[in-house]
Amino acid sequence: MLTMNDAPFWKTKSLTEMTGEEWESLCDGCGLCCLNKLEDWDTGEVVFTSVRCVLLDGESCRCSDYENRRATVPDCIQLDLKKVHEIGWLPPTCAYALVRDGKDLYWWHYLVSGDIETVHEAGISARGRTVSEAHVDVDDFEDYVVDWPLTVGEKAGEKQRT
């Protein structure tokens, strides 16, 4: 029988109670946060593009210079406790949002599966679907608007790795 001490940290701790290491480990490596977004100034609506940050590795979906990212990308949004509660564009599969809302992580999250590849195998990540902002003029970002970052998790809990 599992006790609270046996349960994983994301089931027993709130985001505010997590250590720095636990907080960082919640990132599932999907890369969706690092896609450029456009905001309608009149309505405030935010849409995703398939244009990724220059530092996001398109294959691993991890930042290529995480420790120094703000030196290269000064407007990089560092997800913290305050922002998790304020940002309305977090993908529905985001572990930070799930834990914030008292939900469990999906089967494909590496903390559950034990394998960092399951986020890609489940089709949740940005792998193979993006272009670097280094190759797209900012005036052309509207040509890259996509909705899949908001729909990738619609069936995330239905199938499991075989």
Swiss-Prot record:
The lineage's top-level taxon is Bacteria
Coiled coil start-end: none
Q: Which family does it belong to?
A: Belongs to the UPF0260 family.
NCBIfam families of this UniProt entry? PRK05170.1-5 (NF003501), PRK05170.2-5 (NF003507)
Q: What is this protein called?
A: UPF0260 protein Atu0932
Organism in which the protein naturally occurs: Agrobacterium fabrum (strain C58 / ATCC 33970)
